[in-house]
Amino acid sequence: MNARWLLIPTAATLFGCASVQPTQARRDVGEIVERRVGLPDVVPEQQDAESRARVRARVAALMAEPLTVERALQVAMLNNRELRATLEDLGVAQAELVQAGLLENPTISGDLVNSTRGNGLGGGLALSQSLLSAFLIPAKRNLARSRLAHAVVTVGQATLVLARDVRVAFVHAQAAEQALGLHRGRAQAAEVAHELAQRQFDAGNITPLDQQLFAAALDRARVELADAQLAMTVAREDLTRLLGLWGEDVAWTFAAPLDSALPPETELGNLEQQGMRDRLDLSAARFETQSIEYALTLRRRGMIPQLNVGISARNEVGDDIGHEWVLGPSLSLELPIFDPGHADIARIQAFLRQAQHRLQDMAIHVRSEIRVHRTQLVAARRKVEYYERTVLPRAESITELTLQQYNAMLVGTYQLLETRTDQIDSRREYVEALRDYWVARSELELAVGGRIPAREHGRAASH
């Protein structure tokens, strides 16, 4: 009997001391971010007040300087509230793992009876424990471990998605800011042309139609400038939200314009294999399938009838015995007559087949996404290089030749302004091509689940 009473505190010691803090899980996510995004020490292992204060201090230090894409990524990883909420999934999964290793609490019951013959009060006490709960602990822990692994890769995927979103928003905001400057130059050229046309019209040198055409060109330039201002504001706010900023911090500035130095040519031949190996959402789907398999095993073991054993003590009363305490073992057994569990197992089996089909479908989509983004990256790079080699030099040459002819009085001011406007448009299109390249690269990096491998020998354009 003493051994039975000692069983409960011993089990509490063995199963109740595991930590509910997801320190290791957060460390695993931090390693994912460091290896795949290139940012060390941006996932705090603790969530106490001191840790939060350190995070706020780091964000303030980062925002004290103009933003680079690396600095923006650090701020987002530390300060994005949606990511911080997602990180709490690790705490939920860790707590479930600890819970899975615990025995069910013992049950104590009792009754009190009164003798109808005036012999006094009697009753009893019983303490029981489920043996099935102890038998199921290994299966429960396997299921909980799989769910914790699923949570780690799911949160890791969320960090990669956030990194992609920040990079894309960053280059969109950079491009919008540069486009606004180019639109200002275009509007200034249109204003000069309109003023010149107005003076010539007042002097009677051009027709009313020509004067109205120049006025309409100025109207278009002003409308496009207003659209560019709106686009820049929206792009900045998109990035600001991802960085989790508000108040005075929203007045950030860029450290440099959109990067025109493309990285070396990348090796794109084995990206599908890399994606199938490294995609975290694909790993999450695998862990989801594994979790359902463990759940099925757990449910099958749970078909064993519930068995509770314990110890019972009663105070018996009667005419011939007076008051007497009796002590002995107790046992209760569930009778699975109405619900043997077959329907529940069929439901889990259907979930398992569903998860397997979705895993296969995701694998197909992953390969297709990689091929699409790889094609987009190659096309975007070719477009940027064509602008650098051909379009921009030709636009500059045309402007220089037109200026020479203008100085020689072979062409007029209108043609010079028109040439200058065309050059501005070419430059704006080049900025858009650069933006599309960096967006395509960010999308491909997310599609393969990490960084794109670089060739040993490549070209890096610089301006």
Predicted regions and their residues:
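Terminal intrinsically disordered/low-complexity segments used for targeting and assembly
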Residues: 1-75, 229-274, 445-463
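Intrinsically disordered, glycine/charged-rich N-terminal periplasmic/extracytoplasmic linker segments
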Residues: 58-109, 154
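Amphipathic alpha-helical coiled-coil segments and their boundaries
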Residues: 69-72, 79, 86, 130, ...
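Amphipathic alpha-helical coiled-coil scaffold segments and their short linker/junction regions
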Residues: 72-73, 77-79, 143, 206, ...
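Small/polar-residue-enriched beta-strand and adjacent coil segments characteristic
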Residues: 87, 93-97, 103-158, 267-274, ...
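Periplasmic alpha-helical coiled-coil/stalk elements that build and connect Gram-negative outer-membrane
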Residues: 137, 146, 153-274, 373-376, ...
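Short segments within alpha-helical structural elements
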Residues: 220-247, 358, 394-450
